[in-house]
């Protein structure tokens, strides 16, 4: 075998190997821009996804706070609505280590240092506020001002930030219960007129734990609540791009507008004044 022939074979072998590696990379779903599908942004949420985060369990509609935020972020990143693909995942699998079949996941993930060891988390798109949960038959149902609500019997869970919020905003001392579940039982029995808890928990209580529950009002934002962020695969190339998009949406007031629309106006949950 001549030297030129040996070189030609070596080059051909290297080319085949490179092609095989390229094929493997393509098969794993990792495109050149860090998405699982070329030209698409794949976003996951829970199954089912609840209002007011996603309306009618249809994230593709763009209705609901988190669905609207997801599309706003996608637009800032250069993706048209038609280029957004939705998938479903459980909460726990989303924050577990390992590869993912989505680019972003949004379902009320609190930004947490422990979680960041397993996955990437974006900057915050929402900081929780405190809210008032009551029933349609309670005398507190129409008390949507500080002066009126402070006259009601308010319950909170022990160890929660709700205790300080009630004292600071309403100027009264609430009844403290061992858990949110105990507070719900007290509300059902008429022992208290309303519960104060964080807004996401309030929506859950009203929808799932109370037959005639309603979130009647929310406290003014104080910036002290849990912060929600997107979850991304560990080391994702998109994390910095999502952060940049969120910063733009915060600076131009879009996040505030979406929060007002979907967590206040559409839910008829006024801010206490």
For each feature predicted by the language model, list its residue ranges.
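Alpha-to-beta junction loops
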Residues: 79-81, 99-108, 153, 189-201, ...
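Short helix-initiation/N-cap motifs at beta->coil->alpha
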Residues: 84-96, 141, 160, 175-189
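Ligand-binding clefts/hinges and TM-proximal coupling segments of bilobed small-molecule sensing domains
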Residues: 26-31, 83, 162-174, 244-273
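Extracytoplasmic small-molecule ligand-binding "clamshell" domains
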Residues: 30-105
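Periplasmic-binding protein-like
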Residues: 47, 127-134, 200-203, 207-244, ...
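Acidic, polar ligand-binding/catalytic clefts
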Residues: 83-148
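C-terminal motif of bacterial Sec signal peptides marking the signal peptidase cleavage site
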Residues: 18-23
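Extended ligand-binding regions for polar small-molecule ligands
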Residues: 25, 67, 71-76, 227-266
